[in-house]
């Protein structure tokens, strides 16, 4: 993750007050660019290979937590729950599991009077980019957590961002502009670790049962012809309803008034007869 490269660049200035990680003149790694977190969809590098072996062959954990940098301006740390819309191909139990972990993490910071946690619409992070350490875990039904926290060895200032000052669902406990030290970031990270460990220890049986349930559902779905409703098809259905919004659509072929996924697929492609009443 560029650790030695960034460290050497930071330490190049003898004046400790002028040290900075800015304007690094080269990529961290010539094959994968910014850092090895971008390599988990290919596992091309030895670091990501070894981590994937641990995660998906040796351990198969229920939770994976990736600490990263940096947080959005006017906050301290961005984390789960992530912004909408989430990737609809995942099991809903996985998504609500991520939300539950996020609630435990933000609540822990609030209880310890540590403001500045942002989530949902307050963050740019989602579940859609699927090449990183925590997002590839979703395809294994593992609760993947990512936090992006501010801070570096040189003290910094949390800037004034007016839109961040009023509490809302994205940032329920805003932080005021202030001087920020590296120790503060470490303290926050430790609290977040304890929040995850506390949740895992208290809800061990539930987490184990949930990953079993998600795995069984995946196997069952793979053993039959299974369809996923995509936004394109739901948009087509919305257009049909919009065109006939003052009428009702009655499906003639379905005696039980239940539309199966394969039937709905044909219906949205206009291959199924329906009657407007």
Question: Where do the model's predicted regions map?
Answer:
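Structured catalytic-domain cores with a bias toward divalent-metal coordination
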Residues: 1-277
């Amino acid at each position: 993750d560029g650790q030695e490269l960034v460290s050497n660049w930071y330490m190049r200035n003898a004046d400790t007050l002028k040290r900075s990680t800015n304007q690094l003149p080269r990529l961290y790694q010539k094959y994968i660019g910014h850092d090895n977190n971008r390599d988990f969809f290919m596992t091309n590098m030895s670091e990501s290979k070894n981590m994937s072996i641990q995660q998906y062959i040796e351990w198969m954990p229920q939770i994976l937590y990736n600490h990263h940098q940096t947080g959005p301006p006017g906050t301290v740390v961005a984390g789960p729950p992530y912004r909408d819309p989430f990737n609809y191909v995942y099991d809903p139990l996985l998504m609500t599991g991520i939300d539950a972990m996020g609630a435990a993490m933000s609540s822990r910071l609030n209880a310890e009077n540590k403001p500045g946690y942002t989530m949902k619409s307050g963050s740019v992070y989602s579940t859609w980019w699927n090449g990183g350490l925590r997002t590839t875990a979703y395809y294994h039904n593992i609760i993947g957590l990512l936090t992006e926290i501010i801070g570096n060895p040189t003290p910094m200032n949390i800037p004034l961002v007016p839109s961040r000052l009023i509490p809302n669902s994205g940032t329920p406990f805003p932080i005021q502009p202030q001087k920020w030290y590296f120790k503060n970031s470490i303290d926050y990270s430790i609290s977040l670790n304890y929040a995850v460990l506390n949740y895992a220890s208290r809800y061990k049986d539930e987490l184990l049962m949930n990953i079993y349930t998600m795995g069984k559902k995946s196997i069952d779905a793979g053993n039959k012809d299974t369809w996923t409703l995509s936004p394109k098809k739901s948009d087509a259905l919305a257009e049909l309803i919009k065109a006939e919004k003052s009428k009702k659509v009655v499906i003639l072929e379905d005696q039980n008034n239940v539309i199966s996924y394969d039937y709905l697929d044909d219906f949205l492609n206009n291959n199924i007869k329906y009657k407007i009443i």
